[in-house]
Design a protein with these regions (language model features):
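Walker A/P-loop
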Residues: 5-46
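AAA+ P-loop NTPase domains with strong preference for DNA replication initiators
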Residues: 155, 162-247, 272
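P-loop (Walker A) phosphate-binding loop of NTP-binding proteins
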Residues: 19, 53, 123
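Conserved beta-strand position immediately N-terminal to the Walker
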Residues: 14, 80, 118
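C-terminal engagement/docking regions of AAA+ P-loop ATPases
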Residues: 210-305
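Canonical AAA+ ATPase core
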Residues: 60-65, 88-92, 100-191, 236-241
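Walker B catalytic acidic pair
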Residues: 18, 83-84, 95
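Conserved alpha-helical scaffold flanking the Walker A/P-loop in AAA+ ATPase domains
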Residues: 3-6, 60-81
Length: 305
């Protein structure tokens, strides 16, 4: 839950992966109620069309004149819940690309701005399940976080059984509204990032590429500059979450896995050997020193941005 909150404060899109029934959809629905913002849910299926997400022009007659009127799709909400996103075809998945990056959609040459704040919270099943389509790399890169949802421990299951009833929605009272959420997002953007921390982020992301570190020996493609920006934004949001006005090496290390795991593509040999992006990142954190230069002895020397 903390990672989801950090992702929202960082204005990022979040992908939740796990087996059916683990509460991924409930988490997203509960978040929308707690933040008191609009949410629209789309169940992704193989026959879903791009227009079912972005909206379509509808021919209407008014005063004897026929005109196309744009009918907004479910993407026009503060939160769009893309449920089981990898069950739709790649063409339909790609309909979200412009919305996720530019926070707008273009239909028949006309551009329509999306509400603010806007972010996509998507759920997907592991690709080993039948009827799933891997997300395109370009779309994966637009998700700030990919969070693996694991099975629920026995003690948590006990509390669920005692406090929940199947088919009954839990009562969740709003704790924020849209304007207050926007103000918190701006506060996260204003969190300072010292130059030594920015340097650490740059060296970490660069080290994900083949030939740049020992840890990246089995990597085919490393993380993009967008990943570096996302890592900085997530570190800032975590610092705000913990009541600090500047981010630290610890913040970077706390969010590096959900930011980078889905952006590292291993080569065929590494996959056959059982390597995982998570293992590569663990090795990177051990291999790349946090401090590449002496720590500053004053605030002015820290070059805080």
């Amino acid at each position: 839950i903390e990672l989801v909150l950090i992702g929202v404060l960082a204005r990022g899109h979040i992908l939740l992966e796990g087996l059916p029934g683990l509460g991924k959809t409930e988490l997203v629905k509960g978040l929308s109620r707690a933040l008191d913002i609009t949410a629209r849910r789309v169940q992704f299926t193989p026959d879903l069309l791009p227009g079912d997400i972005t909206g379509t022009p509808v021919l209407q007659e008014r005063d004897g004149t026929k005109n196309f009127i744009f009918q907004e799709g479910p993407v026009f909400a503060n939160i769009m819940l893309a449920d089981e996103i990898n069950r739709a075809s790649p063409k339909t998945q790609s309909a979200l690309l412009e919305a996720m990056q530019e926070r707008r959609v273009t239909v028949m040459g006309e551009t329509h701005a999306l509400p603010s704040p806007f972010f996509v919270l998507a759920t997907q099943n592991p690709i080993e399940l039948e009827g799933t389509f891997p997300l395109p790399e370009a779309q994966l890169d637009r998700f700030l976080f990919k969070i693996n949802v694991n099975r629920t421990p026995a003690d948590v299951l006990t509390r669920i059984v005692l406090n929940r009833e199947m088919g009954v929605e839990p009562e969740i009272s709003p704790v924020l509204n849209a304007q207050e959420l926007l103000e918190l997002m701006q506060m996260a953007r204003n969190v300072a990032i010292p130059e030594v921390v920015a340097d650490y982020i740059g060296r970490l992301v660069n080290a994900t590429h083949p030939g740049e570190s020992e840890a990246s020996g089995g990597v085919k493609y490393g993380a993009s500059p967008r990943a570096a920006l996302g890592l900085a934004a997530a570190a800032k949001a975590r610092a705000l979450r913990h009541g600090r006005a500047f981010c630290s090496f610890e913040d970077v290390q706390a969010v590096i896995h959900p930011v980078l795991e889905h952006r590292i593509l291993l080569n065929h040999t590494a996959r056959l050997d059982g390597q995982t992006p998570a293992a590569v990142i663990n090795r990177l954190v051990r291999e790349i020193p946090a401090q590449n230069k002496p720590l500053p002895d004053s605030l002015a020397a820290a070059k805080i941005h």
